[in-house]
């Protein structure tokens, strides 16, 4: 599956599925400035070199008082990932280089700012080699909030944390006590307090309830909504699920494959009470017969609609990241496809009209974009590769801006 093993063994970072996560550069446009009128649509903010500065940013940095904070899944002094900051001028500083020991390793998820601290997850490392939830000061002092045991509490926290009422909520890709695929478990939904008290809200069984949740949760009207990469009623094609703070899980939708799409690793967004998301594959017969992915909408009571089917050509393929909404239009990225076959930034109307805003060339502008965020009308994001000749010639990733 291309994910991390229990002990945090990296299994292919630059790929079109499980090993990339979103880097969305959250910047303030009035500070950053944005591209001038008439300039190229896309601009590179920072290119990772793959050494001590980190490699393959895999999640969404956040803006805290004009400074960008984020993670790289690899690189750093110990080749186990970093927490970094970047100024609007593109000056990068490594705040913490993970050792791969008790402090964690391979931080896929983005950070969250809560109570003056940064919180995040690392998929590997920790006291039991099963990942950690960590806290960090903006000066770089890291503490482990919770170290997963590798048993019923979960293994490999990959999705971003969210905060509700001062408590953190997230998912683990494996663990939970039920046998699934490689016997590591099928994943969990959990809560953890800043003081380190962890509670499993739901442990996936790997059947119709779903298996291996990857993306971040969305909270709406007292319920958490999320997706699983596998499981469901149609042969491991993934699900949309709902779970309350007290734990009961409800299957909202089971992907069928074909036009309906299959396998999703992105979180959902709530737009006026309707949830929107992406599937990696399905939708048609392109992309070697497996389909090139879809954008879908779904109501909390399970009414699903395919908004757009990617064809795998200039329109893009494999939308691995989630969506954002701006003035009634959806924006997102595809990891592959486009004119340069290195991914795209696209817009999509609710009626299903898609427009490619930028096609990545795979060189200095990056390759494999993995997510966007809107800041005052400007889009910021990152590519998992490209930007230079490091990381075995494929580039170590970039932070970029796009004027929609």
Positions of PLM-derived features:
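Extracellular beta-propeller repeat domains
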Residues: 2-404
